[in-house]
UniProtKB/Swiss-Prot annotation:
Gene3D superfamilies according to UniProt: Photosystem II cytochrome b559, alpha subunit
Co-factor requirement: heme b
GO CC, one annotated term: photosystem II reaction center
Entry note: cofactor: With its partner (PsbF) binds heme. PSII binds additional chlorophylls, carotenoids and specific lipids.
Role: This b-type cytochrome is tightly associated with the reaction center of photosystem II (PSII). PSII is a light-driven water:plastoquinone oxidoreductase that uses light energy to abstract electrons from H(2)O, generating O(2) and a proton gradient subsequently used for ATP formation. It consists of a core antenna complex that captures photons, and an electron transfer chain that converts photonic excitation into a charge separation.
Gene name, Swiss-Prot/TrEMBL: psbE
Family in the record: Belongs to the PsbE/PsbF family.
Record organism: Zygnema circumcarinatum
Residue ranges that the Swiss-Prot or TrEMBL entry lists as coiled coil: none
Origin organism lineage: Eukaryota, Viridiplantae, Streptophyta, Zygnematophyceae, Zygnematophycidae
Keywords associated with the record: Chloroplast, Electron transport, Heme, Iron, Membrane, Metal-binding, Photosynthesis, Photosystem II, Plastid, Thylakoid, Transmembrane, Transmembrane helix, Transport
Keyword DNA-binding: no
Protein's recorded name: Cytochrome b559 subunit alpha
Positions of transmembrane segments: 21-35
MF terms (GO), sorted A to Z: electron transfer activity; heme binding; iron ion binding
C-alpha cells in the first residue's frame, strides 16, 4: 500500500498561475545571464580556457601534441614558453 508524502501533484504545480509568474521571469533571466557570461568572454577568464584566437600563436601554428612518453614535461614547458 502506498502512502501519501504530502507533496503537491505535479499537474497542480504546472497549472498554477504562481508557477508561471515565477518561471516566466527566472527561465529567461538564466538564459540571458548565460549568454552574457559567454559573449563577454568572462567564461574564458573564469575557467582559464584559451579564447578562439589564442589557440595558435604567430610563432607556433602547429598542434601542441605531446609525443614523448618520458620527456612530456619538457615538451609541455616548451609549449607554454611559446605562449
Amino acid at each position: 500500500m502506498s502512502g501519501n508524502t504530502g507533496e503537491r501533484p505535479f499537474a497542480d504545480i504546472i497549472t498554477s498561475i504562481r508557477y508561471w509568474v515565477i518561471h516566466s521571469i527566472t527561465i529567461p533571466s538564466l538564459f540571458i545571464a548565460g549568454w552574457l557570461f559567454v559573449s563577454t568572454g568572462l567564461a574564458y577568464d573564469v575557467f582559464g580556457s584559451p579564447r578562439p584566437n589564442e589557440y595558435f600563436t604567430e610563432s607556433r601554428q602547429e598542434i601542441p601534441l605531446i609525443t614523448g612518453r618520458f620527456n612530456s614535461l619538457e615538451q609541455l614547458d616548451e609549449f607554454t614558453r611559446a605562449l
